[in-house]
């Protein structure tokens, strides 16, 4: 039973619990009308201390489509945080109003702190460069729906692997499925953090390699996960300007990829995928965004004990 559980990190749920969520998400996708009132009377609080379009709207749309309601804020300046209120007090107060919290925060570990003071489920919608578990559920559902299998894939991850929380969460999750291999494509400055390399990949004897060439990595990939270079994570903006366009996926590069390769991206896109790739049958990132809404519907219904 997932009722009343927090989701802070992909490892909080077992593979069996993932499958439970994916099964429900698939059922909702097939027959959304059947689920349009199951969260009637329930309230989701979206506490976004950091800008977001897709994740916040996905959560809000998901709850509204389940028949529930949404309260919250989309930037800290519009809340009592701007008056100096602590995270603890915000969470305790929101517990009085809502049945479920989805929170994004710039500080790593903030979701964990929130869960310590919450009697209602807390969903981590991204904490700094740490984890983004609902994006991971989105990614896994997309792969499962359109690729058919979460095992035995070669996954190339390209771009900002240092600060990219979606990358960290996805590696942690896919490492739990059998026979997956990873190709980590990034500039030296944006390599995967040591804790992912040592505690996840090497500790579990998972095959991986680190390279700097997208052209090389794309040849072997069953799944290519592109990410943007994140301006907001750089202290030195000249360093960002130097690295921002280091990887651009275009049709010329796609010619070197497998015919059935899947291109994913957590969005927003900046320059790292050319618009021409949108017309390629291997581009799945907008289908991925839609899967995100359905998987969040399934997750919230499960955490609230309504399905």
UniProtKB/Swiss-Prot annotation:
Give a GO molecular function annotation for the protein: aspartate carbamoyltransferase activity
Annotated L-aspartate binding lies at 83, 165, 228
Q: Which Pfam families match?
A: OTCace (PF00185), OTCace_N (PF02729)
Q: What class of enzyme is it?
A: transferase
Q: Does the keyword Transferase apply?
A: yes
Q: Which UniProt keywords apply?
A: Pyrimidine biosynthesis, Transferase
Reactions performed catalytically: carbamoyl phosphate + L-aspartate = N-carbamoyl-L-aspartate + phosphate + H(+)
Function as written in the Swiss-Prot or TrEMBL entry = Catalyzes the condensation of carbamoyl phosphate and aspartate to form carbamoyl aspartate and inorganic phosphate, the committed step in the de novo pyrimidine nucleotide biosynthesis pathway.
Query: Subunit details for this protein?
Result: Heterododecamer (2C3:3R2) of six catalytic PyrB chains organized as two trimers (C3), and six regulatory PyrI chains organized as three dimers (R2).
Name it. Aspartate carbamoyltransferase catalytic subunit
Q: Tell me which species this is from.
A: Clostridium perfringens (strain ATCC 13124 / DSM 756 / JCM 1290 / NCIMB 6125 / NCTC 8237 / Type A)
Q: Which gene encodes it?
A: pyrB
């Amino acid at each position: 039973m997932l009722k009343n559980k927090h989701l802070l990190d992909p490892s909080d749920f077992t593979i069996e619990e993932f499958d439970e969520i994916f099964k429900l998400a698939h059922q909702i996708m097939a027959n959304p009308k059947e689920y349009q009132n199951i969260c009637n009377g329930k309230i989701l609080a979206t506490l976004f201390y950091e800008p977001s379009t897709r994740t916040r709207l996905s959560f809000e749309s998901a709850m509204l489509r389940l028949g529930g309601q949404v309260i919250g804020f989309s930037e800290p300046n519009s809340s009592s945080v701007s008056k100096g209120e602590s995270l603890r007090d915000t969470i305790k107060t929101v517990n009085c109003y809502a049945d479920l919290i989805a929170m994004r925060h710039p500080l790593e570990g903030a979701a964990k702190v929130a869960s310590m003071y919450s009697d209602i489920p807390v969903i981590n919608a991204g904490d700094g460069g740490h984890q983004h578990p609902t994006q991971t559920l989105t990614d896994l559902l997309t792969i499962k729906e359109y690729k058919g299998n979460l095992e035995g894939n070669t996954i190339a991850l390209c771009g900002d692997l240092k600060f990219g929380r979606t990358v960290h969460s996805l590696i942690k999750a896919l490492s739990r499925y059998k026979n997956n291999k990873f190709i980590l494509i990034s500039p030296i400055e944006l390599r995967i953090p040591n804790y992912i390399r040592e505690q996840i990949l090497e500790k579990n004897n998972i095959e991986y390699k680190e390279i700097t060439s997208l052209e090389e990595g794309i040849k072997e990939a069953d799944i290519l996960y592109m990410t943007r270079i994140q301006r907001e994570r750089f202290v030195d903006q000249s360093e960002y300007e130097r690295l921002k366009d280091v990887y651009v996926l275009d049709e010329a590069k796609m010619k070197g990829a497998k015919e059935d390769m899947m291109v994913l991206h957590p969005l927003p896109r900046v320059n790292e995928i050319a618009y021409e790739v949108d017309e390629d049958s291997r581009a799945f990132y907008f289908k991925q965004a839609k899967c995100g809404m359905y998987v969040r519907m399934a997750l919230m219904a499960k955490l609230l004990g309504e399905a």
